């Protein structure tokens, strides 16, 4: 999900061209309307999978404490869902990152298959064998417009 700002060849949802955005400057002040925008942006993109949110655990906890409106007793995130979409947790994205979309549009390509090699020499003194597995893969986004990311400004 995360690209590498130092190497433009390594992109993720956060740096990919064409990914749509919703501006939420301060998550603690987010509104229900802010989160309805995520689905509105991908709704016309002919998605085939089930859209989901991905965010940090702290962000999900914050949204569990923000009321949808005054008086209903309902919250933006209830039962780890926002507007019927699952909220998944990823500890490797940025603290402020929120992604939404059809993750079946993230493709993984592999070359040459899985290569497994046995090294009988490295641990020979202890009677063990080292198993080495290599897989060459790359990731691509089929349709960036099926994703939305939160931006702060």
Question: Where in the sequence are the language-model features?
Answer:
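Active-site pocket-lining segment
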Residues: 56-70
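Sequence/fold signature of self-assembling virion shell proteins
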Residues: 67-153
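Alpha-helical scaffold segments that mediate packing/assembly in large oligomeric complexes
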Residues: 1-42, 149-153
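Hydrophobic alpha-helical scaffolding
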Residues: 25-31, 53, 75, 121
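Short, conserved, surface-exposed binding loops centered on an aromatic residue
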Residues: 40-47, 77-80
